[in-house]
From Swiss-Prot:
The keyword Lipid biosynthesis applies. Its EC number is 2.3.1.180. InterPro entries: ACP_syn_III_C, ACP_syn_III_N, FabH, Thiolase-like. This is Beta-ketoacyl-[acyl-carrier-protein] synthase III. It is found in: Cytoplasm. Keywords: Acyltransferase, Cytoplasm, Fatty acid biosynthesis, Fatty acid metabolism, Lipid biosynthesis, Lipid metabolism, Multifunctional enzyme, Transferase. The active site is at residues 114, 257, 287. The gene is fabH.
Amino acid sequence: MTTKSYILGFGSHAPERILTNTDMEAFVDTTDEWITTRTGIKQRHIAAEGETTSDLGAKAALQALANAGLHADALTHILVATCTPDAMCPSTACLIEHKLGVSGLMALDLNAACSGFLYALNMAQGIVALTPDAKVLVVAAEVLSRRINWNDRSTCVLFGDGAGAVIVGSHPNEGRAVEVADSLLSSDGALGDLLLISGGGTSVPYKHGQPVGDEFFVRMEGREIFKHAVRSMARVCEELLERNGIAREDVDMLLPHQANLRIIEAVGKKLGIPADKVFVNLQEYGNTSAASVPLALADADSKNLLPPGRTVLLTTFGGGFTWGAVLLRT
């Protein structure tokens, strides 16, 4: 019999500083109306100088631990999904481990861009299946504000900083069981150049004494991203529902990657899921990449939107291309 995996606690953290659309009018050629009508975003959180991805991730982790009624010394593994790590080495996971005051855990980072949290959640499922006593901290955290060209209106209005976290284990908390029932993940590396940060790696290294170019910031082909994101998320959701014998009308909540309201609405429409069943909070946070889904999950949990008996469908799409869906049962 396969060991089941459950989310034991939810946590999130966003930086204190808020940058509104109106604030952005002062330094980029845009307006609140232009941003809102095209993206649905009203504001985003921006990390303070010196505030790092591991800082945000550790705070989200502490909240998830408190929500689960656990101390950090109960953890056995730490998985961190990020494309904006503190450093190339050591891993952000090891830095979070240290900030939680523990050591001796298996700790690693993974990069699947905006799909990172779902990839990490799938890995946590596998760990729990192999080690039923494991308690896995899954963190997704990003400081994208330092990888944005703030003169590029097509990208700088979209992204924000934040972190989300969950604790995964085989024994549900008394009175609350959020089962990670199934997942389906995919990728297509042939399309990687449509959404990327190429600078800083071995293909486009930093060269001493030379100015940092656009290669070190997020670059994307918006129209192509929209088309592929909607098609990929809708298709993977359909496949996951069919595999589990679930009709679309039996989905109680669709919680998609909070990238752009137009994409979210198009995915919901393609799946035939009414808007009142689609969770949206990007108006408050913008696109936080890998952090968007766990941040939204923690938000939904805090609003008591995950009561017993719910079928919840998570889906995401990101650079790579990567995409996927996860089925939760409460």
